[in-house]
């Protein structure tokens, strides 16, 4: 297949070509071979200097001032502040330096970024029937993902002009340029290769009419190697394919008292190698095709745990019971029940620490800028006590189908206990690290998963509908980690932050006592009394904060539908999330004054007595009190319920078939990220996208099968 799309910025485009083929051969009565190949080639192109939100001017400013004009009434591109103030630019202009103004729209097409991507996946399966009831499989999978990129910043781009001007010296009225004229070329070459090998033996044997045994045992080895290389050139000339040399060892005086600087090499290299080895067994014994006993076991090892075998290997197992209720004699009269199955499992699973190792990892990063000697940085400190997180699960399930498959359902109730919970824990800052992944405690979780699917017909039409519903609640029952500063728990539940007796991703806030009716100051509570001592309020103990709940939705799911009539069909899906909280953004006056970082809540601020009855946004105060800002920013006024219902996607299609041939196809038009149809908050906010809304994607396409 082939598809072409446009990006989210002007001039951006991408192409993708996909190929997939599957083949099978039977070599005699017992031996067969299957293989699959998948190839994806893609290309992307963007103007890398295209201004994006938020536009950060620099120089301590984190946002562009409101109502900034990028184009005048006659269509001319206008400049905005970028790193330097106007008086500094006037001086540079008087000294004859290059134009140092930043015009975002003029700079848009001065720099380009191109990338070429390829993804190849091969899978081979050698299948051999040892005996009629005993089969063996040897499976090999190879994956290769590579990308090449080229980023070119033109000589007249702001990036290059900025560097040329900064490295310009004025000597006796003459300009000396230490940075070369020309473009900056950056190349990237990334490759990922993985190999997966599996040997598996399966058994399917009946003993008489009442006993059946299904089992498989196997081992799997997986390796993945990631290699990343980047290079670049200064003073690049695309017409003659030349570049200019620069001195990376010299420390230069920058123009206008901007300090000192050195030219950074554009070459970098990195790579990772990971290996995992697994052994597994699955078995099911059935009696009279009604009662079942299952057992599974698995043992995994990973090279991230060094050479200690006991740390590498993590044994996992589960056992289960199965009862086909619909096959019992007392159910024979219930013809409307297709099947009814009860099941239960108990076992242990595991979670490997992602990116955390029990050995010290260092990375060699080149030569030091002053001594020119090679040096290395500690990528992660030693963590010898690190273990897998173990999860014990007890599950009860019910599966059913009624009225010839018109209604199919699955219901699961589970209880989980996590041991050796993995979490980033506050660490001794004198070590150079503020957080370290540790095993910090235990979590108890219980929940319900429900799936219902229906199939109905009406005349020439049909309606297929399914709903997935999940409820999950967790609580930290044991915590051996470090309780950090109060400020660490005020991010609105964006980080894990386990606490005894609380859910994961907890949402805390300062208790608000409303606004002062006299001057609009925010107020809190100190020792049970209304207070405006912001320094004390901002450092209040965690136990006196409001605990709202979790930022992770306890209730979530989706409703998927396909309605067809004749050759036309309509697909749509709704997503829902209930029971969670999030922290909304609001005005922070210090950021407004110092960094031009404003917010629409500025219009809702307290301005006169009586406003405290209709707003929670404090009055503007200058000079600003940073502790006052901090208290309001993290107060309960900015904690909002996150319940929502969203139309995720919708598609209208037409299916066709060419008579007297095997050619079939579809034409369709659809949209993704359609939008919210209900939210619980009154702020008109989308809890999933607090900055920019998710882009709505419109697609038109088709496919043909020969």
What name fits each language-model region?
Residues 2, 37, 574-576, 651:
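A mature extracytoplasmic/lumenal domain signature
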Residues 7-8, 304-305, 582:
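Extracytoplasmic/secreted cell-surface and envelope-processing proteins
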Residues 105, 158-161, 168-171, 577-666:
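Extracytoplasmic gating/loop element in the C-terminal half of outer-membrane beta-barrel translocons
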Residues 293-301, 529-552:
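Catalytic-site beta-strand/loop segments enriched in glycine and acidic/polar residues
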Residues 1-14, 45-54:
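Periplasmic-side early beta-strands and strand-to-turn transitions of outer-membrane beta-barrels
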Residues 16, 22-31, 36-41, 96-153, ...:
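Extracellular/periplasmic, surface-exposed regions of secreted and cell-surface proteins
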Residues 40-94, 149-171, 224-249, 340-366, ...:
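A surface-exposed, glycine/aromatic-enriched loop/edge motif typical of exported proteins
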Residues 548-585:
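Glycine-rich, aromatic-lined ligand/substrate-binding cores of catalytic
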């Amino acid at each position: 297949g082939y598809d072409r799309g446009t990006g989210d910025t002007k001039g951006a485009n991408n192409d993708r070509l996909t190929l997939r083929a599957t083949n099978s051969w039977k070599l005699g009565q017992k031996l067969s071979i299957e293989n699959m190949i998948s190839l994806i080639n893609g290309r992307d192109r963007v103007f890398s200097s295209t201004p994006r939100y938020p536009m950060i001017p620099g120089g301590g400013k984190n946002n562009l001032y409101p109502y900034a004009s990028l184009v005048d009434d006659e269509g001319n591109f206008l400049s905005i502040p970028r790193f330097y103030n106007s008086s500094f630019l006037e001086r540079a202009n008087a000294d004859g330096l290059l134009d140092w103004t930043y015009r975002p729209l003029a700079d848009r097409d001065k720099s380009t970024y191109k990338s070429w991507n390829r993804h190849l996946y091969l899978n081979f399966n050698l299948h051999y029937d040892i005996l009629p009831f005993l089969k063996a499989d040897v499976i090999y999978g190879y994956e290769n993902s590579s990308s090449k990129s080229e980023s070119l910043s033109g000589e007249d781009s702001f990036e290059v002009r900025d560097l040329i001007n900064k490295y310009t010296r004025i000597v006796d009225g003459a300009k000396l340029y230490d940075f070369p004229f020309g473009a900056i070329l950056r190349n990237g070459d990334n490759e990922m290769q993985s190999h997966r090998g599996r040997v598996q033996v399966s058994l399917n044997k009946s003993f008489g009419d009442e006993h059946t045994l299904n089992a498989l045992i196997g081992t799997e080895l997986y390796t993945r190697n990631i290699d990343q290389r980047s290079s670049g050139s200064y003073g690049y000339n695309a017409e003659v394919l030349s570049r200019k040399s620069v001195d990376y060892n010299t420390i230069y005086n920058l123009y206008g008292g901007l300090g000192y600087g050195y030219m950074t090499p554009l070459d970098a290299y990195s790579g990772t190698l990971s290996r995992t080895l697994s052994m597994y067994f699955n078995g099911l014994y059935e009696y009279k095709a009604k009662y079942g006993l299952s057992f599974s076991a698995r043992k995994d090892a990973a090279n991230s745990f060094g050479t200690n075998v006991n740390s590498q290997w993590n044994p996992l197992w589960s056992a289960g019971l199965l009862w086909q209720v619909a096959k019992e004699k007392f159910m024979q009269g219930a013809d409307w029940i297709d099947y009814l199955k009860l099941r239960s499992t108990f076992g242990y699973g595991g979670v490997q620490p992602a990116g955390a190792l029990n050995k010290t990892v260092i990375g060699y990063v080149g030569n030091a800028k002053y001594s020119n000697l090679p040096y290395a940085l500690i990528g992660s400190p030693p963590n010898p006590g690190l273990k897998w997180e173990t999860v014990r699960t007890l599950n009860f399930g019910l599966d059913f189908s009624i009225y010839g498959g018109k209604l199919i359902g699955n219901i699961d109730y589970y209880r989980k206990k996590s041991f050796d919970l993995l979490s980033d824990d506050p660490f001794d800052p004198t070590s150079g690290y503020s957080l370290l992944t540790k095993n910090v405690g235990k979590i108890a979780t219980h929940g319900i998963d429900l799936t219902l699917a229906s199939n109905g017909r009406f005349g020439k039409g049909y309606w297929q509908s399914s709903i997935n519903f999940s409820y999950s609640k967790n609580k930290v029952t044991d915590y051996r980690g470090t309780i950090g500063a109060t400020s660490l728990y005020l991010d609105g539940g964006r980080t894990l932050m386990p606490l005894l007796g609380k859910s994961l991703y907890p949402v805390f806030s300062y208790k608000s006592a409303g606004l002062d009716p006299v001057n609009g100051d925010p107020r809190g509570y100190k020792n049970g009394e209304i207070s405006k001592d912001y320094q004390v309020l901002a450092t209040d103990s965690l136990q006196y904060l409001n605990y709202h709940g979790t930022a992770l939705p306890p209730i979530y799911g989706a409703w998927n539908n396909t309605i067809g009539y004749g050759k036309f069909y309509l697909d749509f899906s709704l997503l829902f999330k209930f029971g969670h909280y999030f922290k909304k953004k609001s005005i922070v006056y210090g950021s407004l004054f110092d960094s031009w970082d404003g917010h629409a809540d500025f219009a809702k601020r307290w301005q006169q007595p009586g406003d405290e009855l209709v707003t929670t946004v404090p009055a503007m105060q200058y000079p600003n009190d940073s502790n006052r800002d901090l208290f309001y920013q993290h107060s309960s006024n900015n904690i909002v319920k996150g319940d929502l219902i969203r139309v995720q996607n919708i598609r209208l299609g037409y299916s066709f078939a060419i008579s007297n041939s095997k050619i079939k196809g579809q034409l369709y038009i659809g949209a993704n990220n359609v939008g919210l149809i209900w939210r619980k908050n009154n702020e008109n906010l989308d809890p999933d996208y607090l900055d920019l809304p998710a882009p709505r994607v419109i697609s038109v396409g088709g496919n043909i099968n020969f």
